[in-house]
């Protein structure tokens, strides 16, 4: 993102925000409520249109592309809300995602088994979506997001509504995705969990990036502690 701006009525909620996510890098976009982080995130996703600035994937601008076209060029979005089909099994949920990306025949079955094994969901492959725990659902959702072999994944509140053990599992999955060369952008209200996995973080307030750096740099920033983390924050 380069110099992105967004105004709703008379209020400028995002004011000249720039940040980048590289291949094989996990980046966090954080900040207090009303900071503009969610609007900035949604402009990358394609849910909100910027008033000014540009959004690029590599050297190509994707600012004018709708969500489905962004997915085709390698940008996968995982929303906070449940995105699996509750009345389909885990196996069927993944198959639907593969078919949506035009994968069929033997290749579809082979990719299905690869994803089931990679995300350790073989024991629940015949379980219905409505019967999954929060952590299991997240695993299946990420498996579905990988159906199209994306270059980048956008994770909206990936740690919301799951227990501590599941948080550690999701963090490990994110590390594996990073090791595969996939770039990942995370926005989440669970600050400690997010800073525990990202390589770099941007902290927003009043529509602008106020602090940026590694997890350690952000966690020890006096400015970030003053307006967001609190004086007693520890990683």
Regions inferred by a protein language model and the residue ranges of each:
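Conserved ABC ATPase signature
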Residues: 128-132, 136
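The feature captures the beta-strand-to-loop junction immediately N-terminal to the Walker
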Residues: 30-32
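Helix-to-loop junction immediately C-terminal to a conserved catalytic motif
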Residues: 45
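Conserved ABC ATPase "signature" region
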Residues: 95, 106-124, 171-175, 223
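ABC ATPase NBD coupling module
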Residues: 61-76, 81, 105-109, 125, ...
């Amino acid at each position: 993102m380069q110099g992105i701006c967004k105004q709703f009525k008379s209020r400028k909620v995002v004011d000249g925000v720039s940040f980048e996510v590289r291949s094989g890098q996990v980046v966090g976009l954080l900040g207090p409520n009303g900071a503009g982080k969610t609007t900035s995130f949604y402009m990358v996703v394609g849910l909100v249109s910027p008033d000014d600035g540009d959004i690029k994937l590599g050297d190509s601008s994707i600012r004018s592309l709708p969500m489905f076209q962004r997915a085709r060029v390698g940008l996968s979005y995982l929303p906070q809300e449940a995105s699996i089909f509750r009345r389909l099994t885990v196996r069927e949920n993944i198959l639907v995602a593969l078919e949506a990306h035009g994968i069929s025949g033997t290749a579809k079955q082979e990719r299905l088994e690869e994803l089931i094994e990679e995300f350790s969901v073989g024991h629940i492959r015949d379980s219905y979506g409505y019967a999954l725990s929060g952590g299991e659902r997240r695993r299946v959702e990420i498996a579905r997001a990988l159906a199209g072999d994306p270059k980048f994944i956008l994770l909206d509140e990936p740690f919301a509504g799951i227990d501590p053990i599941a948080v550690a599992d999701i963090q490990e999955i994110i590390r594996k995705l990073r090791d595969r060369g996939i770039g990942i952008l995370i926005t989440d209200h669970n600050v400690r969990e997010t800073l525990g996995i990202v390589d770099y973080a941007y902290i927003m307030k009043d529509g602008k990036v106020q602090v940026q750096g590694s997890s350690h740099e952000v966690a020890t920033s006096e400015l970030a502690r003053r307006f967001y983390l609190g004086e007693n924050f520890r990683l």
